[in-house]
């Protein structure tokens, strides 16, 4: 009778990750895989993960002070690939431990970081090389190409390589960058016969 008298309760669109109780209502495994993505162990509606800014803001409440989103977590923020189940962060100066995150310590320049919707995150190029380094040569090729489709370029990748930990033991990664994104001599320079050729770089970027 109360329902008839007052009508249904006001409904509001969900704009946050769903809690366990909410995700158990009207469950359908097939729809779950289409409508939700598991991030840090929680089901999140896909429409909240469409952009870099949305993904960065989703992780920001879990980000410890004075740290940056790093590694696979940063890769997901930039590309939307491989949602993290545990947050990986980087600390420049502080040395501390957090049970809820995987923390690494790096001394990196400001050029290797980006602010995404106000959330500090390692840059796309550095995230790509960290992923490629752990994935190996075969998968590393696809990772670099994916990074380029999301805005990375040869110059940025080579700069990031200079700050990559273990680069001296992983020269194959630099070779892979040069193989996939070779420097191209400008045709205008070739036409002038100039000995000091201007170098352009291949850029597969697209607007995000």
Task: List each model region and its residues.
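Short gly/ser-rich loop at a beta-strand->alpha-helix junction or flexible surface loop bordering the NTP-binding
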Residues: 1-208
